[in-house]
């Protein structure tokens, strides 16, 4: 036993010497090493299974099953989504359809409609402007919904209906006062927000001032705008023309608020030259003008009295009551006034003998035509090419009329025709805006009475 220990010590000493000859650093390490012969026997422990490393999911794989609009991201090619087995689906959409979570239904495209929703598709890259515009115009966000509701409610206000005859015509056509959503969506302000009519209909359902039909194709006001309401509004609304250079809402409110409280202001711009909008949209003028609504008619009358700039008749501010200058009422009154003037001013003659018209014979007409008197003034190309006979001329009853440039008309009976004394067939002369006859003195020249001797 002692001999075996001695041999082991010798072997260790030999090994130590061999290591000392290898180098300084190795010798230092060998000097620090001590062999412990009394150490217990080493017994290896039982091997423990190391945890399996987590395998990251393959890029492009999603669970639950994600589908693009028009294709499946898994590329199963089932035909329902239209992926065609490409592995990435259709890349034409920037939104992903998220279906149900049943793994057995992934390749059958069976999804729960209640749990379906859309998320953004990062795999599809669009330009920033196109991506933002498409997402904003095809999705009904809260901001977009509020803008649509605010704009359409403004279009249905009393002042807008008064200034915009197009919407009023649509309201009058429908027995319930509905306006097509397609027309509302075609306006410039709404088209700038969205071109989707369905989104406009969905947004308007949240309005408390508007009612959308069940099919979502028509919209109307909750309270109808009657003719009585229109007349009352016109009575307390004034029209302002020749507006100042700064015709902003704040500046106009400051100007017209001097006489009383201003409820609403609408600035009406002139129509564009190539615009297809009806002329009824601009009631009063083809220039820029403003409609100012006051609380009552007293304040409106006061505004007309105080705010008119009569010193500058060309470019000064013009303020008028809307009720007094409605085009329809002016046209109606003018027609009635013209009828009264025709019946009162034009005399009727029962026989041709009492008529003061000039009677010229055929020979006199020939002589006058040769002398360039009446015929010369009348017959310079007038009536040529129309198949008219140069021998039949008359004014008043059953003939035709012509003037000689001095505001005087010659009455010549038609040859071979029966004379009739109906005043309705007389040609109307020019009229002034108030309905009175114009150019009664022949543009400032004294009237000349013609007789057969002068001819």
Curated annotation (Swiss-Prot):
The cross-references to InterPro entries, in alphabetical order and at most eight, read: La-rel_plant_RRM (IPR034878), La_dom_prot (IPR045180), La_HTH (IPR006630), Lupus_La (IPR002344), Nucleotide-bd_a/b_plait_sf (IPR012677), PAM2_motif (IPR009818), RBD_domain_sf (IPR035979), RRM_dom (IPR000504)
Which Pfam family, any one, appears in the UniProt record?
RRM_1
Q: Which UniProt keywords apply?
A: Nucleus, RNA-binding, Transcription, Transcription regulation
Among the record's GO biological process terms, what is one? RNA processing
User: Cross-referenced SUPFAM superfamilies, in alphabetical order?
Assistant: RNA-binding domain, RBD, Winged helix' DNA-binding domain
The segment(s) forming the HTH La-type RNA-binding domain are 138-229
Transmembrane intervals = none
Which Gene Ontology cellular component terms are annotated? nucleus; ribonucleoprotein complex
Any one Gene Ontology MF annotation carried by this entry is: RNA binding
Bias (Basic and acidic residues): 1-20
Q: Where on the tree of life does the source sit, at the highest rank?
A: Eukaryota
Q: Which PROSITE patterns match?
A: HTH_LA, RRM
Residues of the region (Disordered) are 1-29, 348-396, 414-455
Q: Does RNA-binding count among this protein's keywords?
A: yes
| Known function | Transcriptional regulator.
Question: Under which name does UniProt file this protein?
Answer: La-related protein 6C
Q: From the UniProt record, report the name of the gene that encodes this protein.
A: LARP6C
């Amino acid at each position: 036993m002692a001999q075996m220990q001695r041999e082991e010590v010798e072997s260790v000493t030999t090994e130590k010497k061999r290591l000392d000859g290898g180098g300084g650093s190795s010798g230092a390490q060998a000097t620090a090493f001590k062999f412990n012969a009394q150490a217990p026997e080493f017994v290896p422990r039982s091997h423990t299974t190391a945890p399996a490393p987590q395998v990251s999911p393959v890029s492009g794989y999603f669970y639950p099953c994600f589908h693009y609009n028009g294709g499946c991201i898994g590329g199963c090619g089932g035909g329902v989504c239209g992926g065609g087995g490409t592995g990435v689906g259709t890349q034409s959409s920037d939104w992903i359809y998220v279906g149900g979570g049943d793994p057995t239904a992934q390749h059958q495209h069976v999804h729960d409609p209640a749990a379906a929703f859309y998320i953004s598709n990062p795999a599809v890259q669009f330009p920033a402007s196109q991506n933002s515009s498409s997402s904003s115009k095809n999705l009904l966000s809260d901001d977009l919904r509020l803008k649509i509701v605010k704009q359409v409610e403004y279009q249905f206000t009393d002042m807008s209906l008064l200034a915009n005859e197009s919407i009023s015509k649509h309201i009058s056509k429908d027995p319930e006062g509905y306006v097509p959503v397609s027309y509302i969506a075609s306006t410039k302000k709404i088209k700038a927000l969205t071109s989707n009519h369905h989104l406009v209909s969905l947004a308007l359902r949240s309005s408390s001032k508007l009612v959308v039909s069940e099919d979502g194709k028509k919209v109307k006001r909750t309270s109808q705008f009657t003719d009585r309401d229109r007349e009352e509004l016109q009575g307390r609304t004034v029209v302002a023309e020749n507006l100042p250079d700064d015709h902003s809402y704040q500046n106009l409110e400051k100007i017209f608020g001097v006489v009383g409280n201003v409820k609403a202001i609408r600035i009406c711009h002139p129509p564009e030259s190539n615009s297809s909008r009806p002329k009824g949209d601009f009631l009063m003028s083809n220039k820029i003008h403003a409609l100012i609504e006051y609380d009552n008619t007293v304040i409106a009358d006061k505004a007309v009295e105080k705010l008119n700039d009569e010193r500058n008749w060309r470019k000064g501010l013009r303020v008028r009551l809307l009720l007094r200058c409605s085009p329809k009422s002016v046209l109606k009154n003018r027609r009635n006034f013209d009828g009264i003037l025709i019946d009162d001013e034009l005399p009727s003659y029962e026989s041709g003998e009492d008529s003061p018209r000039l009677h010229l014979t055929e020979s006199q007409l020939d002589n006058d035509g040769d002398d360039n008197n009446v015929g010369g003034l009348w017959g310079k190309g007038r009536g040529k090419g129309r198949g008219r006979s140069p021998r039949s001329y008359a004014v008043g009853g059953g003939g035709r009329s012509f003037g000689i440039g001095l505001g005087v008309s010659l009455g010549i009976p038609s040859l071979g025709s029966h004379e009739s004394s109906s005043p309705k067939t007389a040609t109307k002369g020019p009229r002034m805006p108030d309905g009175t006859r114009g150019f009664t003195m022949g543009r400032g020249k004294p009237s000349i009475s013609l007789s057969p001797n002068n001819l």
